[in-house]
Structure formats: C-alpha cells, structure tokens
Amino acid sequence: YVTSSSSSQRFNEGSWGPYYNPDNYYAAGYQGINDINAFLEYSVGYKDKLAVKRDTLTLDGKRKYEEDVLQVERFIAEAHALRAYYHFELAKRYGAIPIITEKTKDAAAARKPRQSFDEVAQFIAEETAGVMGGLVSSWTDVSMPTQSGRVTQNVARAIKARALLYAASPLHNPANDPAKWIAAALAYAEIINTNKFSLYKDYRSLFLDGVSAEKEKEIIWAVRFSAGNSMERKNYPIGTAGGNTGVCPTHDLFLAHGHKTV
C-alpha cells in the first residue's frame, strides 16, 4: 500500500503524463545549463577581473592572487564538465535535445533545433576531454578532502563514458555498430587504467566518519549529505509516525524472486 500522491503510485496507476511527470527534468536541466553558460560568459577575462584593486606585486599579494586564479580555473573546468552532465541527463530522458552553449534570456531564445543522441554524446565527449587539464585528480590529492563531491578528472571521464555507452546501446544504435561499443569501452578503460578504484573494506563506514583517501577508492562522484534518518522514516509503513511506505516493489519484481507460501 502506498499513498495515492506518491510518484510510484502515479506510475502504478498510469496517471502520470505531460502535466505530472515525477521525473520531469527538462526545465531544471536547462536552467542548470543556462546558469553555467552565464558563469562561463562572466568568467571571460577572469585574470584581469581578479587583479582589479588588489596587491599583485608583493610576495603575499601575488600568492593570494595566484590562488584565486587557480580556483577560478578549476571552477571553469568543472562548469564545462557539469554542462556535459546536464546535457547527458536531458538526453538520457528525452533522446534528441538542443545543445545550448550560450546564455539565453528567455524561452524563445532557447528554441533551437534538436540534435541527435549521437551528436549530444559527441558534444559530451569533447566537452569533458577539453577540460581534463583544469580538473584535479582527486580532492585528497590536493589536500582538500572537504571538497569531495566536486568534479574531478575521473568524474569527467565517467560522464563521457556513460554517454558513449548509452550511444552504443540498442536504443540509440539499432544497427549495432561495433565502433560505438569500442568507443564506450575505451572511455571506461581510461577510468580503470588510472588504478585508483577498488572496493572499500567496510561498506557501512563508507558513509560515516568523513572522507579519506582510502574511502575515495570506491567513490567516483560523491553526493554530499547530512546525517539523518528521513529516508528510513519515509520507508516506514503508513500508520507509523512519518511513514510513507517509500519502498514499493512491483508485483513483477516480487514474482522475480523466490518466495515461500505461508
């Protein structure tokens, strides 16, 4: 049993549609892209902007200026990778989509022709490959473990690899072109060959006690969160405090597993 307003029940009933789509990412995705494009547009000439009305001559002043320049350069590289990520999430849901690389002031300005999934995947591959030099290998490598969750080189590689894998799948590759599978395999090999990843020894503690170099071996892209039990409470049965029966397996999923008649 589940509440009638929950997303899973909407899917079960077939009551979702263009006016209620629990996975409606279109507006949010393009808003994110537009925000990134605005940042990239504003960041042009960032070195000169950072030098305005500040000391860049003394040793200490020059050091602080160079630190700020490095930080902005990282932000720019991360922004390009995130723009690729947003395009992937949109294409994953909607297939052919417009590729937007300039800030738009209104919806009419964003009405561009859709481009095929292959074209989007190629854009993602080029967008991520072009900023690898500006991304850190990991945040612990640069003594900034608290920044875990921001984009790294392997995050960018993973975005590219997944886009190429989807492009090779039967949905977007009905002719089963082997070149697309090879491109996806090579993209994943870039991650594997870094030899940075392995399973962490204690899965439970992976989510506790902060970030460490050892834990990062299992994590390509971390999601930051604050400790709490709201997710578990939402899984409680209806009738308990805060319960929403959040876990709603379908009947087909139930039948796919062994069960015993009581």
Describe each model-derived feature in a short phrase:
Residues 1, 98, 139, 148-151:
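Short, solvent-exposed turn/loop segments enriched in Gly/Ser/Thr/Pro and often Arg
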Residues 89-93, 98, 139, 166-175:
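Short coil/turn linking the two alpha-helices of tandem helical-hairpin repeats
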Residues 70-77, 142-155, 204-206:
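A glycine-rich, coil/turn loop motif that links secondary-structure elements
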Residues 35, 74-76, 81, 96, ...:
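Extracellular structured ligand-interaction cores
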Residues 2-94, 109-111, 115-122, 128-143:
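Conserved, well-structured interaction surfaces
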Residues 1-7, 132, 150-262:
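An aromatic- and glycine-enriched ligand-binding surface/loop that stacks and positions planar moieties
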Residues 103-107, 189-190:
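Short edge-strand/loop segments of extracellular domains
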Residues 38-40, 87-92, 98-100, 123, ...:
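Structural recognition of the beta-strand scaffold that forms the well-ordered cores
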